[in-house]
Swiss-Prot record:
Family: Belongs to the CHAF1A family.
Acidic residues compositional bias, start-end: 155-168, 177-196, 513-524, 532-547, 806-815
Source organism superkingdom: Eukaryota
Lineage: Eukaryota, Metazoa, Chordata, Craniata, Vertebrata
Organism expressing this protein natively: Danio rerio
Protein name: Chromatin assembly factor 1 subunit A
Gene this chain is encoded by: chaf1a
């Protein structure tokens, strides 16, 4: 039986795993070996091409050859171990890849003739070295290159077995990842096959001839190439077969150990990865627990701080409440002490009254008892009703409400005496409309705000309660302040009997606690040890007088005897005493009455009829005569005025430009400078009449030619003269801040001014005038009390008559408002002093300055 094996180009690289694990080697030529059993000779048919061809068609039928029991057994064993081919492809063909191989030199094929004498040495042909692709046998492959494979005499069954084992021994891709149990089963099957091979080889030894040549085994599929050995005789075939089986078993054991080692390594790596992962998880868990613990500790700390703060606040609040309660208790105790003192004083007073009453009982017989009328006499004299007094707020109803004529009354009497039977009284009664009468209380006209009071009119007993309302006592039980006693005439639109607890925020302010605003008056100076004794004694005397009060007109027995003896008229004396008694009663009653202040209207008084009363003289209106109008200005006056303004501006520029003071200080300094220039005999720039200009004129010049603002040239706000004005007067080189030597006190001198001056002003001695003394106190700058404003706010120009460093109250000091006429024109308003020429230029004045401009303004020299 001929067994043909088609070896792949790279059997170890056919699977993906072997392709990845192994290193690429040079392709080796595969050879087809034909083995002939005894009594059967086969002619070797060498392949033209080293590449084996695979048939895609059906497999050729087996040739019918005589077979024995051993061959049948071998074939059955081979068919049992190897699966049948389907369409010429085995189970491993799907894992093999076809690659285009480079043409290699053809290797000679070895033909083994088993019929020849076994004593002859087998003809050996050099076989090309087979390069193993497995990395585990790489070194062995390198050592075996260039050596020839030894041929071992084997039987056909052994050859087939070896080929089948070689095919089975090819490293395949572990697709299913078999478990350890399957691997053990495979190992057991391999051991059984090895035992069967050993038995078969032992049984064939008697059949095979000793001189036959053993067929060459295909070693291309073996992972480890065997070393070249000389052909042995037939007696050594059993040993070689045993060695081969042993080598293969050792190889499988090594592979299993390697696999086991790889599995252990993989398991170890897996365990290490798992341990690392567990360690990482444990660290993450510990970190998370640490964070949670820190968070919890922080939360507990915050909660503790919050609780401590709350307790501290509650404690402070409790202390405040306790202090407030103690203060309240002290006030209550003080009030109770005061009340106790008052009760003690009241008790002492009652004791004194009792003593006085006892004294009065003793001296009561001295007083003349008053005669009282008997009740019967009073009832008979007054009738059913006792007399009563009609007070100011009372009025009696009229006696007859319906005023009837006598004829009507007579008809009524006649009808009552003899009623008419023809008349239907019921119809008359139902059809008759009753007459209506006016109100019982007569109407009084409402009094106006102005009440005319004559000199002879007497004061009323009290205010008219119908007009001012009833007196009310408003007191709350939880208040310390005294109750309110007075009138309350306001009516609420929200509070009503149905809603007594509604809030009325229009009339009452519920946010303010009036009890907290109440402060008890401090006790006055105690006069109990100094003047109080005299007062008490005087009070006791008054009490005694009240107890033994004798009204005017009362004469004890024997008092009027002298007057009668002198010949006085007793009737006149009684009338005189009665009048004195009435005056005395009026005087006593007027002391305890409440009088209402009422407005007194007097007038009207017409002019020219009578001289005005003296009490109206303080309120008389002063009639002012209009001011005389000046003549219109001429061009010559305008030119002279313009020239004077230019001279003033020329003198004012060194003082004004770069000055940090207000216009009030600048004007005062400039006027003082002009005054000293006038007093100097050599330097007199102006006439005597025009020497000192008015303040308002200087103010207008400053307003027209300069602005008060902050620029980059200086860090503070100061006066800056317009650039065109400086260019017109050739004063562009004026320093900022100004270097003026001040003649007056109170000016705010900057730091740069202390270093020196440029001599822009005369070096005259500073003289203090009365006007400077008067204004020195009010000329202090308040800029040092002000905070610095922002850059954007400082760059804005400020009006000269608006915000200044000082309060401008010059007009109030120098000008007096006399009057103003609505019909006066602007020309009349702009009149000025006789010392200065009349201004023709219209001035920009506000409504408040209009009256001030119309009046003559005295200068500091004339003030």
């Amino acid at each position: 039986m001929v067994v043909v094996m088609l070896a792949a180009e790279e059997p170890l690289a056919s699977t993906p795993r072997r392709d990845m694990d192994c290193v690429g080697k040079a392709n080796t030529n595969k050879k087809l070996v034909q083995a002939r059993l005894p009594f059967k000779r086969l002619n070797p048919e060498p392949k033209e091409c080293n590449e084996p061809k695979r048939t895609k068609g059906p497999v050729a039928p087996k040739c019918s050859e005589p077979s024995d029991q051993e061959n049948d057994q071998d074939s059955s064993s081979i068919s049992h171990h190897g699966p049948a081919l389907v369409n010429g492809r085995g189970p491993l063909d799907c894992f093999m890849s076809r690659r285009k191989r480079s043409p290699l030199r053809s290797a000679p094929e070895a033909t083994i003739d088993l019929t020849e004498d076994s004593n002859d040495s087998a003809k050996q042909q050099p076989a090309p070295p087979i390069a193993a692709t497995c990395p585990l046998s790489e070194e062995k492959t390198k050592t075996s290159e260039g050596t020839t494979e030894p041929t071992i005499p084997l039987t056909e069954e052994e050859t087939e077995k070896d080929e089948a084992e070689d095919v089975d021994a090819l490293p395949l891709l572990d697709i299913t990842q078999d478990s350890d149990t399957e691997e053990e089963e495979e190992e057991e099957e391999e051991e059984e096959e090895q035992q069967q091979e050993a038995e078969v080889s032992h049984g064939n030894e008697s059949v095979l001839s000793t001189g036959s040549t053993s067929s060459a085994s295909v070693i291309a599929s073996s992972p480890e190439p065997s070393k070249s050995a000389p052909t042995t005789p037939a007696s050594t075939s059993r040993i070689n077969a045993a060695n081969k089986v042993k080598r293969r078993s050792l190889k499988s054991v090594q592979e299993q150990e390697e696999k086991q080692r790889q599995r252990d390594e993989k398991e170890r790596l897996k365990q290490e990865a798992k341990a690392a992962k567990e360690k990482k998880k444990e660290e993450a868990r510990k970190m998370k627990e640490e964070k949670e613990r820190e968070k919890k500790e922080k939360k507990e700390k915050d909660e503790k701080e919050r609780r401590e703060k709350k307790e501290r606040d509650e404690k402070e609040k409790a202390d405040k409440l306790k202090a407030k309660e103690e203060q309240r208790q002290m006030k209550i105790e003080a009030k109770l002490e005061e009340k106790r003192k008052k009760e003690e004083e009241k008790r002492l007073k009652e004791e004194k009254d009792r003593i006085k009453a006892e004294k009065a009982e003793i001296t009561r017989f001295l007083q003349k008892p008053k005669t009282q009328l008997a009740p019967k006499t009073l009832a008979s004299a007054c009738g059913k009703f006792a007399p009563f007094e009609i007070k100011a707020h009372m009025s009696l109803a009229p006696l007859t409400r319906v005023q009837c004529e006598d004829s009507v009354l007579e008809d009524l009497d006649r009808y009552l005496a003899q009623p008419d039977s023809t008349l239907n009284g019921l119809k008359d009664w139902t059809g008759h409309k009753p007459r209506s009468s006016g109100p019982t209380r007569p109407r009084h006209s409402a009094q106006g705000d102005c009440v005319v009071i004559t000199e002879s009119q007497k004061a009323d007993d009290g205010p008219d309660r119908s007009r001012y309302g009833r007196m009310k006592l408003l007191h709350f039980h939880d208040n310390y302040r005294p109750a309110y006693w007075g009138t309350w005439s306001k009516k609420s639109t929200h509070i009503s009997p149905r809603c007594p607890l509604r809030l009325d925020k229009d009339l009452l302010d519920y946010e303010v606690d009036s009890d907290e605003e109440w402060e008890e008056e401090e006790p006055g100076e105690s006069l109990s040890h100094s003047e109080g004794d005299d007062d008490d004694e005087a009070g006791e005397d008054d009490d005694d007088d009240d107890g033994f009060f004798v009204p005017h007109g009362y004469l004890s027995e024997g008092e009027g005897a002298l007057e009668d003896e002198e010949g006085g008229d007793p009737e006149k004396q009684k009338v005189r005493q009665r009048m004195k008694a009435r005056e005395w009663e009026n005087e006593l009653m007027s002391k305890g009455k409440v009088k209402v202040l009422e407005a007194v209207v007097r007038g009207c008084f017409w002019e020219g009829e009578k001289p005005l009363p003296d009490f109206l003289q303080p309120y008389a209106v002063c009639m002012l005569e209009p001011l005389s109008k000046d003549e219109a200005s001429t061009p010559e006056q305008d030119a002279s005025r313009q020239q004077r303004n230019e001279k003033l501006l020329t003198m004012l520029l060194p003082l004004l430009h770069g000055n940090v003071n207000s216009n009030k200080v600048i004007i005062t300094e400039f006027l003082e400078f002009c005054r000293q220039q006038t007093s100097s005999p050599t330097e007199s720039l102006l006439n005597t009449t025009e020497s000192i200009p008015p303040r308002i004129h200087v103010r207008r010049i400053i307003k027209e030619n300069a602005v008060y603002e902050k620029r980059s040239t200086f860090k503070r706000c100061c006066w800056y003269v317009h650039a065109d004005v400086l260019a017109r007067y050739s004063q562009e080189a004026l320093p900022v801040p100004c270097q003026w030597s001040y003649l007056t006190s109170g000016a705010n001198v900057t730091r740069d001014e202390h270093s020196g001056s440029q001599g822009n002003s005369p070096t005259t001695n500073s003289s203090t005038t009365p006007s400077n003394k008067r204004k020195s106190a009010s000329s202090h700058s308040i800029t040092k009390y002000m905070k610095k404003c922002g850059e954007s706010e400082q760059t804005e120009a400020m009006e000269t008559d608006g915000f200044q460093a000082d309060t401008e109250d010059d007009e109030d000091d120098d000008c007096i408002i006399i009057g103003e006429q609505s019909g006066s024109s602007e020309q009349d308003i702009n009149t000025s002093l006789p010392q200065t020429d009349r201004e023709t230029e219209p001035m920009d004045t506000s409504a408040s300055e209009t009256a001030a401009l119309a009046l003559p303004c005295p200068t500091p020299a004339t003030a």
